[in-house]
Amino acid sequence: MFKSKLYFQLKKLKRSFLIWKTLFLLLIGLWFDNFIFKFFLKSSAQKIHLQEKRARWFTKELIQLGSAFIKIGQLLSARPDLIPKTWIKELTTLQDAVPPFSFTKVTQIIREELNSNYENINQLDSVPIGSASLAQVHKATLENGKEVVFKVQRPDLKTLFKIDLDIMQQIAFVLQKNKNWSRGRNWVAIAKECRKVLMKELDFNCEAQYAARFRQQFLDDENILIPEVIWDMSTERVLCLTYLKGIKISNIKDLKDQNYNLTKIAEVGAISYLKQLINYGFFHADPHPGNLAISNEGKLIFYDFGMMGNITNNLQKRIGSMVKSAALRDASSLVAQLQEAGLISEGIDVGPIRRLVRLMLKEALTPPFSPNIIDKLSGDLYELVYETPFQLPVDLIFVMRALSTYEGVGRMLDPSFNLVSITKPYLISIMSSNNQSPNDL
């Protein structure tokens, strides 16, 4: 017992040194960048270049620090109120692919978690089909002949997360004490929320529930496939799903060789997102190309349900009115709707928000539509949120990021893809169901 406690404390001390060293180097780097810009550089383009360079360095450091900080970086990419737009752009590219751990450990963890149910596995592939910061995925065949995949959590991950998140709390306390660094943000509360989210992500029972709920939403959709959870083979550290074979959506050559209709596939994904956001209020928050594939039948497959988002009932009920206000380009009405839905806190000066919304509506609704309109609007929103002392709900940021990410996927499939023009017929049907004139669109 004494040795294990000593080992834990020594490990925590070593991690603490590495993490604080990284923070110190970051602060020195930011001070140096500000000094260079203030006295030697004149243009905003040069400042942006410096920010991008520092953001790339920070992203690499997060990867070096390991699983917990990779996940922290991904969470920061959804917080435009905390970091500038140039940093968000870099952090959204943060990949958490890491070398796989040994197959011996994989079988050991599955045995420990499944107990006697382990005997239901007929064959378990030794080579993973995917390896990330939290887990790796192995294909398997059960005794009943069903093909499945096992998502297996990395060894000792909870212990490592506890150490790193404890240190992150200390850092948040220091930032909170310094007015120049805190920028009016409650870093201690942010660190606590971050801890809550990450520890929840380590519980694969939560992901199993998310996957089951998401699958239920699309059971009757002939264009969408979602893997089924194998409940008696899933635990806190092991998630078992049916294996859905498909061609990764980024493999355009193979998709074309199979004569798939890429334009239709892009539209199917776009409409699925409208259904997720408007009909169900529960959406896949990370639709990057690695999480999407096309089945042999040409159906869109979603993978990985660790990062999902919710839309409140209050917001869902107001979507029809918001669409009406947006269609009429009535920025004041739309901002009022956002306030009533609880998306903008009371007491906030809505003047800057109203001006930005007016510009966003003009850009979004005036033909010809920009092919990357969501990405452009997200950038405008992020700049406003960073510069003003208010915080948009994280799930709303996840919505913008998910739509922006899928917009990129759509353009990859079809260069003429435009999210606004595709969704217009769907929005017209919503307005009609809310007794509003679709002619306004």
Features from the language model and the residues they span:
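Glycine-rich ATP phosphate-binding loop
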Residues: 139, 146-153
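Helix-rich C-lobe and terminal helical cap/extension of kinase-like folds
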Residues: 6, 46, 52, 235, ...
